[in-house]
């Protein structure tokens, strides 16, 4: 028997003599409707990363995989850490072996299939680590391109994926300019960072924030002027990734270098 996902992929609607692919329509999703019509919340979750404090230990990645049951050995992760090594001649070298799940065990740059690249210490101008995750944008393109409403935004601004509605079309994966989405290796539906929404709803911090021993990651309510994260964002120089795309990302960075894309 054909399930709903298979039906949605193959279904065509005939109207007025025209054949219209179902992917051109918006399928009703009651959960998304509730998220859109629930009114403005007093909470808008945002994330803050302090580049100066990140040491690339990988504890955050481990914690995320365990908390959210992300396949341990599969080459997928909801959050990861990139290592940047900038040489004096201006070359930018970036790696993130296993998403930094095990930290950075070698001083050499992991170039995947190309192999390891050794950079002499005297040639290095600067080096730093950059944690990345879903930006839970105010204007999320992934929500806009999903043809069945499986990707939606909560009243608190968290972007989620409803596995039971996702048909695995991949539009959201291709539509995300941050490359934070992937296909679940077994369920074949879109997956991403949920900002540990299940924990936030219980008054807990995200798993990655709890796991970071140096306070490089923080989560807060931008609509609360007394929130420590809000105070930092409103009083210090912070940056976001790919601001030019107009997605209005809500992951803010302290100490973000111009080399980071």
Language model features by range: what are they?
Residues 1-261:
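Non-ligating segments of multi-cofactor redox enzymes
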């Amino acid at each position: 028997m054909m399930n709903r996902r298979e039906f949605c992929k193959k279904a065509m609607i005939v109207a007025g003599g025209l054949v219209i692919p179902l992917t051109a329509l918006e399928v009703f999703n009651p959960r998304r409707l509730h998220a859109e019509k629930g009114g403005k919340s007093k909470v808008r979750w945002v994330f803050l990363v302090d580049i100066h404090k990140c040491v690339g230990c990988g504890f955050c990645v481990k914690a995320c995989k365990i908390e959210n049951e992300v396949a341990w050995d599969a080459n997928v992760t909801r959050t990861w850490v990139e290592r940047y090594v900038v040489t004096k001649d201006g070359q930018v070298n970036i790696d993130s072996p296993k998403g930094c799940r095990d930290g950075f065990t070698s001083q050499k740059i992991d170039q995947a299939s190309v192999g390891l690249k050794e950079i002499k210490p005297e040639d290095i101008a600067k080096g730093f680590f950059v944690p990345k995750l879903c930006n839970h944008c105010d204007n999320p393109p992934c929500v806009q391109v999903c043809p069945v409403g499986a990707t939606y935004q909560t009243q608190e601004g968290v972007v989620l994926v409803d596995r039971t509605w996702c048909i695995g079309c991949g539009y959201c994966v291709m539509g995300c300019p941050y490359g934070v989405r992937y296909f679940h290796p077994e369920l074949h539906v879109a997956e991403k960072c949920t900002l540990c929404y299940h924990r936030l709803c219980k008054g807990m911090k995200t798993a990655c924030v709890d796991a970071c021993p140096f306070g490089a990651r923080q989560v807060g309510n931008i609509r609360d002027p007394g929130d420590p994260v809000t105070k930092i964002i409103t009083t210090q120089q912070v940056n976001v990734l790919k601001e030019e795309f107009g997605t209005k990302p809500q992951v803010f960075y302290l100490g973000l270098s111009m080399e980071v894309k």
